[in-house]
A protein has these predicted regions:
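Structural motif
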Residues: 1-5
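Glycine-rich phosphate- or other oxyanion-binding loops that anchor nucleotides, phosphorylated ligands
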Residues: 6-188
């Protein structure tokens, strides 16, 4: 999760480890890379990275949990150099859209558009939800060849009321994330 606010203490109250990566792509990439490096330095296998977070959506109503199976950058715009929207220049080995196998069949699948802005207007790139960390986390996992799963709780409509809606939906999101985590733990046991 990006912020302790998103977790509402529900994971910690059960003694579960959580990495809060901070807001935005740079903070997310740094925090996860550092955590994975700690695993490597300790001689441990890389974990299945499970990202829970909130997202805005103009396609799905607030209160919907979605599994993001694909990730794009909604704010990478170098079209002036002839590079497609969402593509990082000179990153030829990285696909425009990062995809991962689904883990939660009970959830609808979604494409997550990540950018370093709190979205309040329509996106220029095709995506179902918008967030500020998903693509960065997905790219780190793709590069490190470790499993990645991301579930987003639609907290707002990515519109003019997004800020207030986001805050009012945090507790519901945290409880749903815990349910999904516990279901995954049971499944893996």
């Amino acid at each position: 999760m990006a912020l302790e606010l998103e977790g509402q203490g529900v994971f910690e109250s059960r003694g579960l480890p959580v990495l809060y990566c901070g807001v935005g792509k740079v903070n997310a990439a740094y925090a996860l890379t550092r955590r994975l490096a700690d695993y490597r330095h300790a001689g441990r296998a890389l974990p299945h990275v499970l990202n829970f977070g909130t997202a805005g959506s103009r396609r799905h109503p607030a209160g919907t949990a979605l599994e993001c199976h694909a990730f794009v950058q909604r704010d990478m715009d170098v079209r002036g150099l002839g590079v497609p929207l969402g593509a990082t220049p000179f990153d030829a080995d990285i696909p425009l859209r990062l995809e991962f196998p689904p883990v939660f069949p009970q959830l609808a699948q979604a494409v997550c558009g990540t950018g370093d802005s709190f979205a309040t207007t329509e996106c220029a790139i095709e995506c179902d939800v918008v967030d500020m960390e998903g693509y960065a986390l997905a790219k780190v996992c793709w590069l490190e060849r470790t499993r990645f799963t991301s579930v987003k709780w639609v907290s707002d409509g990515a519109d003019s009321t997004a800020g207030a809606d986001w805050q009012s939906n945090l507790h519901h999101a945290a409880e749903r994330f815990l349910q999904l985590y516990e279901h995954l733990e049971e499944k893996d046991s």
